[in-house]
Amino acid sequence: MAFRKENKIKSNFSKITIGLASPEEILENSSGEVLKPETINYRTYKPERDGLFCERIFGPIKDYECHCGKYKRIRYKGIVCDRCGVEVTEKKVRRERMGHIHLVVPVAHIWYFRSLPNKIGYLLGLPTKKLDSIIYYERYVVIQPGCVDTVGELDLLSEEEYLDILDSLPRENQLLEDTDPNKFIAKIGAEAVYDLLARLDLDSLSYELRHRANTDTSQQRKNEALKRLQVVESFRASRGRNKPEWMIMKVIPVIPPELRPLVPLDGGRFATSDLNDLYRRVIIRNNRLKRLIDIKAPEVILRNEKRMLQEAVDSLFDNSRKSSAVKTDANRPLKSLSDSLKGKQGRFRQNLLGKRVDYSARSVIVVGPELKMHECGLPKNMAAELYKPFVIRKLIECGIVKTVKSAKKIVDRKEPVVWDILEYVMKGHPVLLNRAPTLHRLGIQAFQPKLIEGKAIQLHPLACTAFNADFDGDQMAVHLPLGNEAVLEAQMLMLASHNILNPANGAPITVPSQDMVLGLYYITKLRKGTQGEGLTFYGPEEATIAYNEKKLDIHAPIHVYVEDLDENGNLVKTMVETSVGRLMVNEFVPKEIGYVNEVLGKKSLRDIIGRVIKACGVARTAQFLDDIKNLGYYMAFKGGLSFNLADVLIPPEKDELVQKGYDEVEQIMANYNMGFITNNERYNQIIDTWTHVNSNLSNILIKQLTADNDGFNSIYMMMDSGARGSKEQIRQLSGMRGLMAKPQKSGAEGGQIIENPILSNFKEGLSVLEYFISTHGARKGLADTALKTADAGYLTRRLVDVSHDVIVNEEDCGTLRGLVCTELKNNEEVIASLYERILGRVSVHDVIHPITGEVIVRSGEEIREDAAKAIQDSPIESVEIRSVLTCESKKGVCAKCYGRNLATNRMVQKGEVVGVIAAQSIGEPGTQLTLRTFHVGGIASNIATENSITSKYDGILEIDELRAVEAVDEVSGKKHLVVVSRLAEMRIVDPNTKIVLLTHNIPYGSKLFFNNGDSIKKGDVIIEWDPFNAVIVSEVSGKIEFESLVENVTYKVESDETTGLKEKIIIESKDKTKAPAAHIVDENGNYLKNYSLPLGAHVVKDNGDVVKAGEVLVKIPRAVGKAGDITGGLPRVTELFEARNPSNPAVVSEIDGEVGFGKIKRGNREITVTSKLGEVKKYMVPLSKQLLVQENDYIRAGMPLSDGATTPSDILAIKGPTAVQEYIVNEVQDVYRLQGVKINDKHFEVIVRQMMRKVEVVDPGDTRFLEQQIVDKLEVMDENDRIWGKKVVTDPGDSQTLQAGQIVTARKLRDENSMLKRRDLKLVEVRDAIPATANQILQGITRAALQTNSFMSAASFQETTKVLNEAAINGKVDRLEGLKENVICGHLIPAGTGQREFDKLIVGAKDEFDRIFANRKNVVDFNAMDKDDEE
């Protein structure tokens, strides 16, 4: 496919077009016809002439040597031998010269009639079955009925019918010209299809189909027409580039022989590429057919042979598509041309995107604690081999040897002189280290190598986190950057000491771990009652002297004068209480951040490193990290911090707690046996009991460990510092192992918990049964991990594929839109603070402090740390920030919308590949997510339910949408309101500034103790409600009557275990006509209100009871929302990114309105929503679902009517694009947060932006789009701009140039009409052009990746043949804008240092530039020349 310019391949092309090849093009690219199926002469091993490996066609096998040996050596280059016809040239031309095969009969290309959608079938309007019967020579097709009126065009005829018609025709009919409309023409095979395609008039077909799509009433026919239109339009769009008849081939190309090699094995056998077999079958059948035609064989035999030729060509192009694939002797299907492109082993992924490189090595890694942050240790032999060319050059330069060959020998012999030169060559020439799997960009970093003895690579211990490496036998690969630019990039951008921050969240990633943390924790911990406690020293030096003289313990609390920062950030001397250990640490801490006086655990270390980076920059941080690394290791060794069995303390209270647990369980079992509680409740209560025992034991245990040895218990120190181990693990060592999950068959059925806990811990040892139960979980864990890794890897791949072309392409796109950002809360607990969410983003508006009125941030400015802190501390609740979701860049995104680059803490630069970084940041922690679906069961999850709203502020209460009835508390006799509206919302407002301090929804049925407009004091309880039950409250007073309440049909009676009261519980009735309901009537029996009773409701009142307004009629236990399984972890992330609909979706209201209940039909209840304007929507909700609304409730659009998860497509349709974007971002964030993984929002936003790129055309208007077509947002905008202000001709009048339906500019129309007017002819009539309207759609990442503008990127992702197939017909052009396309073409990626604007730069020395600049009069001005050209 390379451009052949004098046989040179141009590599600086800027786009690639794909299309169908015409027979002429195939011949033009071919170097000769392959006539024989022979490959190689088995005796001479030379290619046969005119065969598949022929030298005359494809070029010589040996460099500059013809077949017969008449011409040898380079001096005959370019001569064509007169005896054997071989051109004398290099042998590598056999990699690029193509041949061809002339087929006797045309053959259909399998891609275009066997794949869906069936392209040839759609063009001709034939179903696949019929088309197959024509192509495979079973039926004749009528191409032109002529004078025969019994058949029509495209009718299929059997052979008998065909012959009958021929017989009935007059003799001279067959002698007519083919163009004569009276001639009857019917043909068979691909030839017939060729004729049909060649006769198509695409323009009129397009017009006819458009008309049909617009006017047809039947939806099915309309869809059919639209499908056909798409194919027709794609051929029309690629005008001249593609003709439909080229889907039928008369010539097929033969790929170059070196790409389908034939290798002789020992023993006279050959290993051959499958393609050779496939080509051979085509040639044999083609030649046999030629001969049969020459000897005038009977039609039957010919037809069979033609069919076999069609099948042979089919299997050559795509063997896997056929039902009867051609197999080898070993019963393995042969690999056809399509198979060599597909899949992981195909051309795209194996050879174009992932190549093996030279100058690389790999070895085991060991720890290098004495290395600097930017260094690694490289074994001598490895280095000598890697740097060989550089060493050789230096040896020759220094005059040690004269030739390259002798220099090589010296290096191979490893003579002493080599090592000195190697040292010299390695200076300033870093190597890249890579550990597989490379999950994010920190998996490859550059280091300055140091020569070491041995055979293992030494790695800096702080770089382990980024590589996810440990030293239990991990291996790493070394690569050597060769070019100057590569070396420079490795040093400036990839050096390990420059990559201290994690691009996923901006936190330091090179944080000391394990031993280092332990050592630092140990020396910074204070201990009372040690030698020298309470002494005061003048300065750190004195204290150190006292320590060295053994007069002072390292943990002793002492007072010292040190330099620390005051409020204004200036260094001053102050007295602090500290210890010698902390003084040691502070020797290394940069002065800019003051005196660090705290116990150093992993968390606090991370914060300190973050502060150091901000204050002192990267270089100083690297220095600081190395210093504390050394101190940490040294002190861990000095402290002798190991642990023994006696450090594992078992709390003495354990037996008592376990006994108590057994007693409770016995009580629960007794209740169950007496029938007070159901089996499910019993199970939940038992699980609950043991969970409590376990957590109580853990708390006692941790308390005890903390007290042990003044907190210097080794195990406790390891846990507390964050070096190793967790509370969970310590609990298992010395508490009890607790409850275990039952092994489940598949990930789908959430794991039940075994109700007998493991009471032993590891110190006491487990019994056989306990061991058996626990070993099961452990093994399953290992199996899960293996599966999970593959899943996470696949997720990353899809994410990269969808986002790789998101590059920062401009500074500012100038959009006025943004996202409103607030802090995220879950039940009043702040999950993500406003500070975290707005830091490093750009504000849309000026942010003004509401009380002081000062401007904190100007619009279009980055919100830096101090500004974010100021906003957080002020009463501002939300800030509108720029986001990639609202960015309006045409290509990629702009820097302002993206904000800060988290890896550098500065605004993102042009050319940063934010898409790939986002994909890696989300994919990399994927392996830490769980695979299982969480089981939420029992009371365990409902412990901390809030049941009231207490004011945290003084202020004034405002309430919206309130409907309430007064009621009196039976116990205290106080009055309160009972809320009966579902949309009530309360706000507390600051009385002076009117700023909203707190907003909250008021739950239905809650008690309200204040009125609208009341003053509230801090700590007042405003509202309270029953946290365990949803209720139905009577809104009026009256008598209650029940309908359809029949014992054991619609309800059953159960007794409450605590009170012994009997309750009626509504059950699902077999009799679907009965719908239980409660009516409230007045004395005269008039209905006042009725309430429908949902499943599982506990009816509190009896028939005929008198109720007061505000009394509870029905309780619906909340826990009835069954112990459901939440899809968690990786499957949930995949579900969201793929925009899949959940298994039990909620029914959602599309409008604001009042709820009404309709009839029950077929197990579904009809619910109507009526808006204030009278619009009515009907929804069918299955009876098995719990309803979330009552009759007469007023609800808002987007609110669910039934339980279940809301589908993303519903949110998009009802609440719009912004809502669905935020929904996906927040939902995915929740999954990661649950695992304690921090990822910045902007990464998710980048992916979601890519999911929302396309729109679906609803009404194409006068544009070139089709209905239901899916197109880029920008394309629709551009097309609408193009036809804006133009006119559509409705009646061309007497105009010669215009036709009906043509789109013209107003000016052209004016000229035309004035001309017609002058001649007194009929004028042209027009209407305004109508623009297209389109709906935003949400695509899953896989679909979005396949729909990119670049066909090469899509083809290398998935469904390769389908993508190429579509692209070829559309004559698509790939403009090489993303990363993948450029990698495939072997170009630099258009990002970072490969940005296209750098292509014009010339890099040179400074003095050179100064010299040119001084004599610049003589220098040609390139810019001026460019301008002239443009003019």
Curated annotation (Swiss-Prot):
Pfam families cross-referenced by the UniProt entry: RNA_pol_Rpb1_1, RNA_pol_Rpb1_2, RNA_pol_Rpb1_3, RNA_pol_Rpb1_4, RNA_pol_Rpb1_5
The protein's assembly and partners: The RNAP catalytic core consists of 2 alpha, 1 beta, 1 beta' and 1 omega subunit. When a sigma factor is associated with the core the holoenzyme is formed, which can initiate transcription.
Note accompanying the cofactor annotation: Binds 1 Mg(2+) ion per subunit. Binds 2 Zn(2+) ions per subunit.
Family of this protein: Belongs to the RNA polymerase beta' chain family.
Keyword Iron: no
Organism of provenance: Parabacteroides distasonis (strain ATCC 8503 / DSM 20701 / CIP 104284 / JCM 5825 / NCTC 11152)
Binding site for Zn(2+) 1: 66, 68, 81, 84
Top-level taxonomy: Bacteria, Pseudomonadati, Bacteroidota, Bacteroidia, Bacteroidales
Protein name (database record): DNA-directed RNA polymerase subunit beta'
Catalysed reactions, as listed in the record: RNA(n) + a ribonucleoside 5'-triphosphate = RNA(n+1) + diphosphate
Keyword list, A-Z: DNA-directed RNA polymerase, Magnesium, Metal-binding, Nucleotidyltransferase, Transcription, Transferase, Zinc
SUPFAM superfamilies in alphabetical order: beta and beta-prime subunits of DNA dependent RNA-polymerase
Required co-factors: Mg(2+); Zn(2+)
Matches recorded under InterPro entries: DNA-dir_RpoC_beta_prime (IPR045867), DNA-dir_RpoC_beta_prime_bact (IPR012754), RNA_pol_asu (IPR000722), RNA_pol_N (IPR006592), RNA_pol_Rpb1_1 (IPR007080), RNA_pol_Rpb1_3 (IPR007066), RNA_pol_Rpb1_3_sf (IPR042102), RNA_pol_Rpb1_4 (IPR007083)
